[in-house]
Structure formats: C-alpha cells, structure tokens
Amino acid sequence: MASQTLVSPSPLSSHSLLRTSFSGVSVKLAPQFSTLATSNFKPLTVVAAAKKAVSVLKGTSAVEGVVTLTQDDEGPTTVNVRITGLTPGLHGFHLHEYGDTTNGCISTGPHFNPNKLTHGAPEDEIRHAGDLGNIVANAEGVAEATIVDNQIPLTGPNSVVGRALVVHELQDDLGKGGHELSLSTGNAGGRLACGVVGLTPV
C-alpha cells in the first residue's frame, strides 16, 4: 500500500518527518503531530459503583432496629446495626434465607447457607454465609455494631437483597456449645425481630 504523508502548514524538510505504521498503512508524521497525539491521551478510569441496602427490623415485642449494608465494587459488605428494646447482653444476629415475614420471623427460614456448611462463627472457615455472630445490648437494651463480612454481597448469585436479617433471644454459641442445635442455629433461641433487606439509593 502506498505511503500516506501528513503535511503541516509550514514547510518541513524530509528528514524531520517520523515514520510509523498501523493496520498495514505506513504513515509519516511530523514531530508536532506525534507530540499532539500522545500528549492528549488520558488513561481510562473505571469508577467503582457503590451499593447500599437497608433492613428495618420489627417483631411482636418492643424490639426494633435499622440495619444498613454498604458495599464498594466487589469488596466486603459493611453492616451497621442499631437495635433497641433488647435485654442486656449477647444476642445472635443472622441473615436468613427468605425475605418472607407473612407468619412473622419464623417465615424467614433457616440461616442463609449457599455453601451447605454447618453453623459457625463469622471468622470460621466453616460457617453459614448468614452467620454474623452476636451483637451486644447495653444496660439500656441498645445494641450498636459494625460488621464487615465478605460472604454477604449485595449483588451476584449470592446476593443478600431480598433475604432477611434476624435478631435472636439468646447468645449464639457459634457452633461450639455442644447442644443439638449448635451446628444449625447456634442455639440462639427465639426470633425477636426481623426485616427484609432492600436496596436503597447510595
């Protein structure tokens, strides 16, 4: 294929032209054209999309609360918890399989467990994805906590959106209590309040 020459407005000697090629086409570029082409290049920046969800917990007792979940790109999910009306002490806190509260919190089903493992602590390798451990209520019955977990994403096949968060009556034994329910529920007792996880604007 014949060479193509870009000519600048001012006369240039033949030795001042630069030669390059692309797609089989030979192109002679004047130095100022080459500088212009490279100096205007800006790298592509990909901005990660943050996601946010909320769950409003209600029950048949005075226990209630609000939980927010946020996730940046594909990173872990940060869960901010504030629940009131609890008895002082530890209470199991889990993500359950279903966002169904038609018959109260019992309709939310078992813990969210896509990997079909036994119950454990949040830091355990073998655990339910929905095992979020315990929250601690103070003398006024208020529990505030921040949980960071990488098994409860807000998007993808294991998204927690549409599932339910549940706070329990008793302390979760984290699968280590030796009770017949330890490896399924942590023997955390009844379900005091629950709420469906739904997306909200960031």
UniProtKB/Swiss-Prot annotation:
Catalytic activity: 2 superoxide + 2 H(+) = H2O2 + O2
Residues bound to Zn(2+): H111, H119, H128, D131
EC number(s) stated in the UniProt entry for this protein: 1.15.1.1
SS bond list: C105-C194
GO cellular component, one term: chloroplast
Transit peptide range per the UniProt entry: 1-48
Subunit structure and binding partners: Homotetramer.
Listed name of the protein: Superoxide dismutase [Cu-Zn], chloroplastic
Organism: Pisum sativum
Gene for this chain: SODCP
